[in-house]
Amino acid sequence: MRMKGFIAGICILAVLSATDAAAQKRLTIIHVNDTHSHLEPERAGEEAGLGGVIERAAYRDSVVKADGKRNVLMLHAGDFNQGTSYYSVLNGDLEVELINAMGYDCITLGNHEFDNGVEDLARRLAKIKCPVVCANYDFSNLEAGRYIRPYTIIKKAGMKIGIIGLMPDITILVPREVSSQIPAFNNAEVVNRWASFLKDEKGCDLVIALTHIGFEGEPYTDPMLVGRVRNVDIVVGGHSHTFLSEPAFISDLDGKKVPVVQDGCWGLNVGNMKVMR
């Protein structure tokens, strides 16, 4: 299975004494996106033999063994559904079981999670054991809203980590009978509101935007988002199937360089970001 590693330092002191260095907090973020029901290694083409949920689990185990479970944060940036017969035949239930078995700490939703309708999405979300985050759509009048929150807070590696979720523009990606039931909020406005809340009121050490809006393409991208917000430390993205071999550092409203990562598609790669604070 092809792997890659991201190393990013967030808020590292310019000068560390020996005591400071020993006390430094180290977090590992494992992330995937757009796995699209690809549960087995690819069978043909340039990617033959790559991917597979068993292989992803083995990689997870190796990272947890090396870094310690309490120091590893696992994220999925959406579109875990649709793309193989596992989804079309089993209606997305197997993917939910595997999300739970993999032990993700948090996920966001992609447009393909809605392919069987919002009612069936609610049925599947009821079985997911980790937080599901989405801040830029209002699900409050739907059954699915019981299982979706704008943000979550997770403690790992001695850090308090706030995670905000974003979905893509479903008005152009999802049937109107579905999208018309789910009012949208402005992406930058909701991220600024929740990021400020997480930093200032909840005392989060780190704020992550877990997005499915794409690194490139139309009508909105992660780089565009970063340029319009503050208080976000990392963007873990999906949707455009972009493979970033290293983080793209984008300036936010305050000129801070924010690392943006995305890991291709189909689970061919597993992102590994090291965060030191």
Feature-to-residue mapping (PLM):
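Bacterial Sec-dependent N-terminal signal peptides
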Residues: 1-25
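Acidic, metal/ion-coordinating pockets
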Residues: 22-277
